[in-house]
C-alpha cells in the first residue's frame, strides 16, 4: 500500500518535503495491457513501486527493513551467534531466510512476518517458501495460515543450492548442468569455421565460465569437486578447439593451446580474493563471524568429520605460507592481498 509506504518513510526520518516529492511521482499513475487485439483501457495503479525507477529499490528496502525489525524484535529468537547475540534472519531484498533453534520460535517468526507484511500489503508466497531441518530430529511443518510449508533436502537461494547436509556437491552439479546447457546452445558457434579461435575463447570465458563458477567462492574443495570441474572445463575446451580423443592431446598441452588454466585454479583464486574481503570486514559482521563460528548445540556423528569451507581456506593459507592472524593483517591492505593472491595463483598455475 502506498500510503503505508509514505508513513514508513516518515518513521525513518525522511523529511516531509522529500516524501511529498515521492508521493507526486506516484500520483495519478496508470497503465494498460497490450494484447494482440490492441491495448486495454487505462486503469489506475494504487499499489507497488514503479518499475525501472531508481528510487524503487530504496523504497522497497525501507518497507522490508520496517517489517523485519518488527517480525524478529524478540531477541530470544534465532540461533546462538557470537558475543551472546542471536542471528534470526538473512535478507536480500524480499529473499528472506528465517533461522531458529526451535520449531516454536520459527513458527512465531513466520507468523509475525506474515502479520506485519499484510499490514503494508505484502504476503508470503506459500508456493515459493520452503523449510529445512538441519539435524536428525523431525518436526511438524511450519504453517502459513492453513498452508503447510514443505520440508526439503536442498533448495535454491540467491542462485545457489543450499543442502541440508551442508554439501557443496549439490551446487557444483547444478552449476555444471546449467553451464552445459548454455554451452550446448552455443554449439553452432563452436563448430563454425568462420569464427576465430580467439573469439570463441572470449565467448566461452564471458558466457559459459561465469555460469559454471557462480558463487564458487563459497565452495569447499574436495578431490571429487576438483575432478568434476576440470573434466567439464577440458571437455568444453576440446570441443571449442576441435580436438578429439583420437588426437592424443594431453591435458597440459590442451591448456597451453587454449591459453587457460584448470578451472579449479580459477576457483581457488576467486576464493582467496573473496576471503580477503571477508577478513577486512568489521568483527561484528555476520560473514566475518561465520568463518570462525562453531555451533554450541548439536552433536557430530561418528566417523571422519566432513570438510568445511574453513578447512579449505586454512589449506589455502598453508599453500600461501601464512597463518590465520597474519592473513587477516595482510588482507587489511587490499592491494597487497590482491598481489599476494595473484602471485600464488601464477605459481600454482606453473606447477
Question: Which residue ranges define each predicted feature?
Answer:
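Short linear motifs embedded in intrinsically disordered, charge-biased segments
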Residues: 2-5, 11-19, 24, 30-53, ...
Amino acid at each position: 500500500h502506498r500510503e503505508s509506504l509514505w508513513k514508513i518513510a516518515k518513521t525513518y526520518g525522511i523529511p516531509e518535503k522529500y516524501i511529498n516529492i515521492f508521493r507526486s511521482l506516484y500520483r495519478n499513475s496508470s497503465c494498460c495491457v497490450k494484447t494482440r487485439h490492441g491495448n486495454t483501457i487505462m486503469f489506475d495503479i494504487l499499489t507497488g513501486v514503479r518499475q525501472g525507477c531508481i528510487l524503487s529499490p530504496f523504497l522497497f528496502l525501507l518497507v522490508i527493513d520496517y517489517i523485519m525489525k518488527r517480525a524478529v524484535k524478540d531477541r530470544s529468537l534465532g540461533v546462538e551467534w557470537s558475543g551472546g547475540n542471536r542471528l534470526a534472519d538473512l535478507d536480500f531484498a524480499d529473499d528472506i531466510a528465517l533461522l531458529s533453534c526451535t520449531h516454536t520460535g520459527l513458527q512465531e517468526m513466520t507468523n509475525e512476518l506474515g502479520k506485519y507484511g499484510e499490514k503494508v500489503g505484502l504476503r508470503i508466497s506459500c508456493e515459493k517458501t520452503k523449510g529445512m531441518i538441519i539435524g536428525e530430529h523431525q518436526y511438524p511443518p511450519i504453517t502459513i495460515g492453513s498452508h503447510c510449508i514443505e520440508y526439503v533436502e536442498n533448495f535454491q537461494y540467491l542462485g545457489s543450492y543450499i543442502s541440508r547436509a551442508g554439501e557443496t556437491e549439490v551446487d557444483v552439479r547444478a552449476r555444471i548442468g546449467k553451464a552445459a546447457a548454455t554451452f550446448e546452445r552455443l554449439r553452432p558457434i563452436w563448430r563454425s569455421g568462420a569464427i576465430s579461435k580467439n573469439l570463441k575463447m572470449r565467448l566461452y570465458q564471458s558466457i559459459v565460465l561465469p555460469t559454471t563458477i557462480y558463487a564458487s567462492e563459497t565452495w569447499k574443495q574436495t578431490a571429487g569437486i576438483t575432478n568434476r570441474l576440470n573434466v567439464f572445463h577440458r571437455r568444453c575446451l576440446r570441443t571449442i578447439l576441435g580436438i578429439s580423443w583420437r588426437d592424443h592431446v594431453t591435458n597440459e598441452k590442451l591448456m597451453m593451446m587454449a591459453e587457460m588454466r584448470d578451472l579449479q585454479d580459477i576457483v581457488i583464486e576467486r576464493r582467496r580474493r573473496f576471503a580477503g574481503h571477508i577478513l577486512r570486514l568489521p568483527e561484528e559482521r555476520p560473514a566475518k563471524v561465520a568463518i570462525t563460528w562453531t555451533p554450541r548445540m548439536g552433536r557430530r556423528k561418528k566417523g571422519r568429520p566432513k570438510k568445511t569451507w574453513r578447512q579449505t581456506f586454512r589449506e589455502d593459507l598453508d599453500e600461501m605460507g601464512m597463518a590465520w592472524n597474519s592473513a587477516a593483517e595482510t588482507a587489511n591492505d587490499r592491494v597487497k592481498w590482491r598481489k599476494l593472491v595473484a602471485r600464488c595463483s601464477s605459481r600454482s598455475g606453473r606447477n
